[in-house]
Amino acid sequence: MSQTKALKVRVTLFCILVGIVLALVAVVTDHWAVLSPHVEHLNATCEAAHFGLWRICTKRIAVGDSKDKSCGPITLPGEKNCSYFRHFNPGETSEIFHVTTQKEYSISAAAIAIFSLGFIILGTICGLLSFRKKRDYLLRPASMFYAFAGLCIFVSVEVMRQSVKRMIDSEDTVWIDYYYGWSFACACAAFILLFLGGIALLLFSLPRMPQYPWESCMDAEPEH
């Protein structure tokens, strides 16, 4: 591998590493979406919520004298209560989430995220082994694993987006306002870096095609 191509590979691997870190942050945190109800009475309290792939957290916030009828922002101080989703931890209760959205959505998003982490692990193993002499070919399966991981993150993001939409549209929930949090942004950035980084790594790791017919003859091994 030439020095120019090796430099491109290192830069691409660094971008993929950033994508891996962002994917891990998105999976383990619970700020994918922030939900708030409509505030009818001023100088009272309202209950906002934020959730991720594994748990939901609600916060009771004091509402001040404001023309804004929404609850929040979520960063305001208040009584906080977090619980893991019932289908992941039977010992915990999360009735709000269980009632207001479909269990299949959260299970699907979490399962696909786990598949993404699995592809990341396989890609990292191949990438580390490729640093040994004459094992540059392992960069190709590593690139595919990273691209697949990015696609899984994208699917998980889309499933979570549909889950939030169903929660807002449901008549059984008090949530009427929502916005996506920083965990969601980390997941979107991870998708871009992993998918595009995987494609770029595949292109950079491919052997150079001969421009002229005689170049392939010159590169051929001599017969004994």
From Swiss-Prot:
Residues 1-10, 132-136, 207-224 are cytoplasmic. Glycans are attached at residues 43, 81. It is a multi-pass membrane protein. InterPro entries: PMP22/EMP/MP20/Claudin, VDCC_g1su, VDCC_gsu. It is found in: Cell membrane, Sarcolemma. It holds the Pfam family Claudin_2. GO terms for molecular function: calcium channel regulator activity; voltage-gated calcium channel activity. GO terms for biological process: establishment of localization in cell; regulation of calcium ion transmembrane transport via high voltage-gated calcium channel; sarcoplasmic reticulum calcium ion transport. Coiled coil: none annotated. The chain crosses the membrane at residues 11-29, 111-131, 137-157, 182-206. It comes from the Eukaryota. The keyword Transmembrane helix applies. One of its GO terms (cellular component) is T-tubule. Component of a calcium channel complex consisting of a pore-forming alpha subunit (CACNA1S) and the ancillary subunits CACNB1 or CACNB2, CACNG1 and CACNA2D1. The channel complex contains alpha, beta, gamma and delta subunits in a 1:1:1:1 ratio, i.e. it contains either CACNB1 or CACNB2. Regulatory subunit of the voltage-gated calcium channel that gives rise to L-type calcium currents in skeletal muscle. Regulates channel inactivation kinetics. PANTHER family: VOLTAGE-DEPENDENT CALCIUM CHANNEL GAMMA-1 SUBUNIT, VOLTAGE-DEPENDENT CALCIUM CHANNEL GAMMA-1 SUBUNIT-RELATED. Belongs to the PMP-22/EMP/MP20 family. CACNG subfamily. This is Voltage-dependent calcium channel gamma-1 subunit. It comes from Sus scrofa.
